[in-house]
């Protein structure tokens, strides 16, 4: 299978090379097209106010735009015959409605879906096992071969410690973090602000955050034009391929 790999962490992401090696080891042709620098939290941002440029960096193509721009150039110029787009693996999970729709990783996958190419966004909690990550992504690729009809993209989140479950998400957590506004004063006497906050300790059952943080499961989310979409067959197949002891799909 010919696969475009992109991300929102740029060409120096520690998870990019292992992912590419893993996909190539099982016979896939991989074309890497990524933003030239980290573009986390870019969502579906696109570039319209300046020219886009592509250059080679080793074996990768790098783009001076957002993750969605990288996918657009990949599918329109560099690899128009790609059969699948994998966005990630993101360094850090994308859980909850804000992270899902604000994520450049997920945004890139949605861009591929809008262009008619099946796509998978993959994110892993910091400290996760790279070998397990590759196993999950390879399982997702095999599951996608059966088709992803009715969805623009599938978003998969991999916990740092897996307790054996795969959960198909039907509801996103509304607020994963207790964000607040922090105010400071710079050396010139001008005010500045940071938005930040700790993760919540409790989540509503049956949300992606509950399955991820409490059940420590791999979560599978289908995204369509109308929001959350069913990916039950995909989730069941993925669970089978990675040896899950519980599949809730």
From Swiss-Prot:
GO cellular component annotations of the record: cytoplasm
UniProt remark on cofactor binding: Binds 1 divalent metal cation per subunit.
Alphabetized InterPro entries for the sequence: SurE, SurE-like_Pase/nucleotidase, SurE-like_sf
Keywords: Cytoplasm, Hydrolase, Metal-binding, Nucleotide-binding
Compartments (UniProt record): Cytoplasm
Gene3D superfamilies linked: Survival protein SurE-like phosphatase/nucleotidase (3.40.1210.10)
EC number: 3.1.3.5
Cofactor: a divalent metal cation
Reaction(s) catalysed (UniProt annotation): a ribonucleoside 5'-phosphate + H2O = a ribonucleoside + phosphate
UniProt binding sites for a divalent metal cation: 8-9, 40, 90
GO molecular function: 5'-nucleotidase activity; metal ion binding; nucleotide binding
UniProt keyword Nucleotide-binding, yes or no: yes
Superkingdom of source: Archaea
Family designation: Belongs to the SurE nucleotidase family.
Biological role stated in the UniProt entry: Nucleotidase that shows phosphatase activity on nucleoside 5'-monophosphates.
HAMAP family hit by this protein: SurE (MF_00060)
The protein's name: 5'-nucleotidase SurE 2
Natural source organism: Pyrobaculum aerophilum (strain ATCC 51768 / DSM 7523 / JCM 9630 / CIP 104966 / NBRC 100827 / IM2)
